[in-house]
Amino acid sequence: MSVALWQQCLNFLQDELSSQQFNTWIRPLQAEDGDANELCLLAPNRFVRDWVNDKYLKRINELLRDLASGKPPKVQLTVGSRRNVAMSSPRDLGAPVSATTMNASRPTEAPAVHAAPRAKGDYADEQEIDRLREREETPRRGGGERQVQVEGSLKHQSGLNPNFTFETFVEGKSNQLARAASRQVAENPGGAYNPLFLYGGVGLGKTHLMHAVGNHLAGQRENAKVVYLHSERFVADMVKALQLNAINDFKRFYRSVDALLIDDIQFFAGKERSQEEFFHTFNALLEGGQQMILTSDRYPKEISGVEERLKSRFGWGLTVAIEPPELETRVAILMKKADQAKVDLPHDAAFFIAQKIRSNVRELEGALKKVIADSHFMGKPITQDFIRESLKDLLALQDKQVGVDNIQRTVAEYYKIKLADLLSKRRSRSVARPRQVAMALAKELTNHSLPEIGDAFGGRDHTTVLHACRKVQTLKEESADIREDYKNLLRLLTS
């Protein structure tokens, strides 16, 4: 009875939450009837359980009270899974997906942003792990001189940047989950979130968080062997080891680390021998309880040129997306960087830069460095006018890239309507809502005035544009769909 009530509750939660929130936190929960009018919700791991308990349990209880004909069931939120139980499947989510029961030596896969549930066939069979256990090392060929060269090139160098710590990382809505997951890994390495897979565009903080975890682990234990490297360095080390007939030294080095942090894993694409070696390294580290953190510019399943068995393993722990920072976070980043540089940056100046530079943190910091340098060399205070002059080339390039016409075409394509209809006088919701969204985007992404934006949308009055902007802001707060649409369009226009 309680499970049926949970299915109704899911329908409301799906309407109220964004698709990212629902798929990440609610959809993975498995429901079963407990004793004495109890509803047991089973989370795949402690991280999901704690997050749901803090953020969503209150709303779940409210919905159950509203939906129950009598006394609402008491919710028991625990970590666990059942054999052959169907995952929660509200309307419009398709047929129920059977939960995969994995060998105890493998961590349960945590939910991933935008990730579809995996089929049983995605996981490697037990024989692969058995073969790894039984595999004997091939005797090494080659002389002692070559051996010294390879061991020297693979000596423990962490590669960590001491400036990248949790304390210097600016948290916001766009990276809150990634930071929380990284902190959990730093406190409990080799646990349920192994590997931790962070993905997102360039300059969003993936590398910073990876270093922050590494620095924390290295600081906890004096002899901790924490290694950070780019995926291409892993490939280069393997190639050198093969050339010197010392592949066993390569294997011993990478399989003896306490934590292995590999950046830009997508560069393994097309490198079959490197993928083969990393596959076995991955298995060895996982079985040894050694932590792995991987980053990529895209979701694991979307990395082309990488074997399916590797992509499947990338999702065995926790997969988290990092989004471009929202305005408030961009301002906070600028203020923190200015404080670190001991520069007096007025808040309105930081706000102005943050409004203009939206794509990623790297470009944001680059713009601030230029403004600070120009201010220092010219002996002038940092004001909005000064920033406008200092960054005029960058701002002109951005305006050229994100013009009103580009916004109009992108919005029309996104909503699958004709551009002519978007600019017409038609007032049907299927056209009016995209038009309002396009106007709001034009106000946020360009330097055009409201009258100029109105002219570009079929000669409309500036008050119409102002109304559209206010309407979209309200809709973003009330509607998960509009909020998701707006975020997707921002990404399309600024990436």
From Swiss-Prot:
PROSITE patterns: DNAA (PS01008)
Localization per record: Cytoplasm
Keyword set, alphabetical order: ATP-binding, Cytoplasm, DNA replication, DNA-binding, Lipid-binding, Nucleotide-binding
Annotated region (Domain IV, binds dsDNA), positions in chain: 376-495
Keyword DNA-binding assigned: yes
Span list, region Domain III, AAA+ region: 159-375
Domain II: annotated span: 83-158
GO CC terms: cytoplasm; plasma membrane
Domain topic, free-text comment: Domain I is involved in oligomerization and binding regulators, domain II is flexibile and of varying length in different bacteria, domain III forms the AAA+ region, while domain IV binds dsDNA.
Family listed: Belongs to the DnaA family.
Subunit structure: Oligomerizes as a right-handed, spiral filament on DNA at oriC.
Identification of the protein by name: Chromosomal replication initiator protein DnaA
